[in-house]
């Protein structure tokens, strides 16, 4: 190409990276028309080949030339040589926003192209001096430099000088052959520049605030600024500390003046100011100060200390790791650092520290909108925050005893961790490379528009994926994506290559987190690579303790045992244990979880293929860890039936079995064990245990809901009792030597069993009824029924097997414990017609058919139960008072010794009994007229009461919430502890409360939160019960609830007495005798 005749061909333009060839030719023609020499045009074309967006760089360059010629500026002075031209074009290709600024601010062109003052080489002190001089302050004043210019002039000068230096930094970054290699330098320069800007803004604030000379003011940088790893465009996290400069300043004046200074410096940095044409620098975020944005803007040092001693949450100490004095009084800044460092380096010993920080990180991930999850360079999985989190956790855990780790910058800290033997050299190098790559991507995305962003370019339908699943990529579409193409050129990559590198980096960061934090917790024989480091005993103990293990020495022994040897189980454990330790650490009791994991391996590791299954199914392994570390009952159950682990890999296998499927199993047992009561009883009880296990696993895994688990357990009880009754009938037919049964027998479910609300530790409340067959006499039928019931009870709860009993509770039968276990239909008819009391009518609201003779059950329910439980006449005042008195006596007498009233989930104030008795009372009052109320379940009836406007929506919500929470808490308590006798009692210790809370959707170690929430719900429920059940006014109900809560800890508990449904029949019997 001749320099005198510059006429680029299409191929020349394409080689330079230009896409709109017609527009490019027109722009070059315009330059020639503006008397730009052909030689300079040729140099421009060559420079465009190095620009990230050549088309935009050319367009902006032409606009700048036109603007300079219009203002009669000497172009050769601003762009004196080819190097300056290349620097300028490279900046224009990486930042459209800077290019548009340059049209009107030639000093930015000069700063980017030649940087005559070499500002890109400034150290921290030189940048500070430059910006202080710009506002007319003395840079030699170390503590209180004061601006001499008025607000508008000073703010304009500060912002202009800041942007001149920013343009030089962008140019230094953009022309680098390897931008990742200089990324730490760029971030440090940006941080130094921000420090200087804040010093200048504080000098302006001193000038503008009366009395500022009496206030020592320091600015503490947090986050990226504090760690000297600032972005181009980012919120700047700050904390302000003030102290009096002389003894005469009172505290109120100090805070008032300090607040004005802080407000003014923020205004200078982030707000529009009258008379200032320069745009603001960046937003200041004070959310990391004590009490966040609700706290005071400025505080004295002692106030900060008091907050961190008494109120700060775990994540706030993690945030303090990056704190650094960035401007203001240096002595006060050092005093702040001296005060906070002990808090930082002892934070890992705080309760649940690492767990809370992990949950905070997880919460941030979960809050990312779904379409952006795989575009988030900073906050997404495998993003910058994952690298920072890994490094910070290692620092905080081991920095307590190793002072060499006490640094704030991510890459410096990673290097120190490698030198200290906490991270292998290879891991440190890989993580450093990944971090720099992602930071450069983030920087390039921000520079383009000089706006805050950390999103990877939008790839349309290919924006989703890259970690667990592949992206749906069309290479042609990627090549047409201008934003992606521009970012890819910054790394010298094709668009599809950048997408692959981004996804590879994210996957590696996630993998490195496991390898760096958890794999060194395995012994040296379990390391997978030669470069892996081995922790000292003390460091290993610190790391186990940090993730929640109460006995780190035992945990180390378990891990050593699990990974020792050359067997298949040991090999698989060496692969999956890092992830297992992480997941166990997320549970309430990691020690229990790891012990159960070891028991499984010892019991089944050599014979079962479950470990291979877990290696291949991440979701199943994670679910298993959640279960083992949160459920003693299920941990023990899995150690008896390891095949259940396979259910965790498929939600379909975890679904509750249908009644038909249960009947198939019970039918098979009937055929197989028809002549052996011991084997049949064992099979039925084992079936119950197995189904509790299935439903418990499903409930813990979130596959089925609370209500579905209750219905599923009810189906299990129905199927087992029906099969057991069938076995007993067949056996007694053979024993009696008859061909057909002398009597039909039915099981009427009562109580929560009747309401289809069976929990994992429930008894089965029932009434047993028989009716003689047409050709049988009463005596034979009665004898037959008694023998059948005897067999039935032996199967379910007799000493015939070591499997846990299924308690068949018959205390709700006529005459209670004093009545016969099984009663004839005629006797039931006579009893209920003549002697039934109000409480028995209420109990019949739950009656339903469960097993046996369906026609007999139907006759009982329709002819005997319905007229009593669905009366057509109103309850009398005497009947109403009888129900209320009975409930009051039950509350007073049935509560176990030593249990406070508000802590019993069933009988306590606002517990299950309050909800159920309230609903049942309203059923007795209205079900005679409203057929929809003729249901057995509590929540079903409550829904109808609300729909029929018999109860307000607000009251229904309170009752429903209390019943649901208390029911789930009972189930959770049983699975957590494995103790049925404690399932109704809310524990006092926070640790056990945390174990129960997990089942209600809380994270681990949230026992206090759960207790507060549950007791608040129960108090509100009790208030509703006081009004709707006891008939008190709102004021009386609130007063009674408050009095109960305040007196609960002082009120002595009475000795346990018999259940009221046992006492009540006894009273009835005495009344009948008196009548006779």
Curated annotation (Swiss-Prot):
<dbReference type="GO" id="GO:0008882">
    <property type="term" value="F:[glutamate-ammonia-ligase] adenylyltransferase activity"/>
</dbReference>
<feature type="region of interest" description="Disordered">
    <location>
        <begin position="1042"/>
        <end position="1076"/>
    </location>
</feature>
<dbReference type="Pfam" id="PF08335">
    <property type="entry name" value="GlnD_UR_UTase"/>
</dbReference>
<dbReference type="GO" id="GO:0005829">
    <property type="term" value="C:cytosol"/>
</dbReference>
<dbReference type="InterPro" id="IPR013546">
    <property type="entry name" value="PII_UdlTrfase/GS_AdlTrfase"/>
</dbReference>
<dbReference type="InterPro" id="IPR043519">
    <property type="entry name" value="NT_sf"/>
</dbReference>
<keyword id="KW-0808">Transferase</keyword>
<dbReference type="Pfam" id="PF03710">
    <property type="entry name" value="GlnE"/>
</dbReference>
<dbReference type="GO" id="GO:0047388">
    <property type="term" value="F:[glutamine synthetase]-adenylyl-L-tyrosine phosphorylase activity"/>
</dbReference>
<dbReference type="GO" id="GO:0000820">
    <property type="term" value="P:regulation of glutamine family amino acid metabolic process"/>
</dbReference>
<keyword id="KW-0547">Nucleotide-binding</keyword>
<dbReference type="GO" id="GO:0000287">
    <property type="term" value="F:magnesium ion binding"/>
</dbReference>
<feature type="compositionally biased region" description="Low complexity">
    <location>
        <begin position="1042"/>
        <end position="1056"/>
    </location>
</feature>
<keyword id="KW-0511">Multifunctional enzyme</keyword>
<protein>
    <recommendedName>
        <fullName>Bifunctional glutamine synthetase adenylyltransferase/adenylyl-removing enzyme</fullName>
        <ecNumber>2.7.7.89</ecNumber>
        <ecNumber>2.7.7.42</ecNumber>
    </recommendedName>
</protein>
<keyword id="KW-0067">ATP-binding</keyword>
<comment type="function">
    <text>Involved in the regulation of glutamine synthetase GlnA, a key enzyme in the process to assimilate ammonia. When cellular nitrogen levels are high, the C-terminal adenylyl transferase (AT) inactivates GlnA by covalent transfer of an adenylyl group from ATP to specific tyrosine residue of GlnA, thus reducing its activity. Conversely, when nitrogen levels are low, the N-terminal adenylyl removase (AR) activates GlnA by removing the adenylyl group by phosphorolysis, increasing its activity.</text>
</comment>
<feature type="region of interest" description="Adenylyl removase">
    <location>
        <begin position="1"/>
        <end position="521"/>
    </location>
</feature>
<comment type="similarity">
    <text>Belongs to the GlnE family.</text>
</comment>
<keyword id="KW-0460">Magnesium</keyword>
<feature type="region of interest" description="Adenylyl transferase">
    <location>
        <begin position="524"/>
        <end position="1076"/>
    </location>
</feature>
<dbReference type="InterPro" id="IPR005190">
    <property type="entry name" value="GlnE_rpt_dom"/>
</dbReference>
<dbReference type="InterPro" id="IPR023057">
    <property type="entry name" value="GlnE"/>
</dbReference>
<keyword id="KW-0548">Nucleotidyltransferase</keyword>
<dbReference type="GO" id="GO:0005524">
    <property type="term" value="F:ATP binding"/>
</dbReference>
